[in-house]
């Protein structure tokens, strides 16, 4: 777990409207090999479930997290504050549905097939070999897991910004 200092978080509504910078009092980011990627923030502002927080880490990597859990609390003096847990934005694909897709060939071809209709696109996909798989009545996120089991490799998200 990494404590985050001097990082600017930009808030976006679930519809992509820029809500400005988030002023926070504490922030931690946890990313692990088991797929955990959580951002925990304490702030005075009211956040809404589904809002997106975009930020740049010390290595120059852009991250996007979705506000998932919100707690409105009070400190010892009765002053209200907000504690939120945010998850990696790839988790939005739990809400995207695959009716019936049967890609075959490279992992890049299969990935493009299951990401069709989402805001995500295939970036660098260098997994060698070919395979085929049926993705039937599952979420895109489940499809990504199935793809990794069938074609191998690891999933990494890259967020590109325009400013």
Predicted segments with their positions:
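Assembly/oligomerization scaffold segments
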Residues: 1-101, 145-155
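Charged- and aromatic-enriched interaction segments used to assemble
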Residues: 80-81, 85-163
């Amino acid at each position: 777990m990494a404590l985050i200092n001097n990082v600017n978080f930009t808030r976006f509504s679930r519809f992509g409207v820029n809500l400005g910078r988030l002023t926070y009092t504490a922030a931690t980011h946890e990313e692990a090999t088991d797929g955990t990627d959580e951002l925990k923030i304490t702030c005075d502002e009211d956040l809404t479930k589904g809002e997106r927080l975009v930020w740049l880490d010390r290595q120059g990597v852009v991250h996007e997290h979705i506000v998932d859990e919100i707690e409105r609390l009070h400190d010892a003096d009765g002053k209200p504050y907000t504690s939120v847990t945010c998850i990696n934005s790839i988790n939005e694909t739990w809400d995207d549905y695959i009716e019936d897709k049967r890609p075959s060939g490279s992992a890049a071809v299969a990935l493009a097939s299951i990401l069709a209709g989402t805001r995500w696109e295939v970036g660098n996909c260098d997994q060698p070999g070919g395979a085929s798989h049926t993705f039937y009545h599952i979420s895109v996120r489940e499809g990504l897991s199935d793809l990794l089991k069938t074609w191998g490799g690891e999933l990494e998200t890259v967020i590109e910004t325009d400013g």
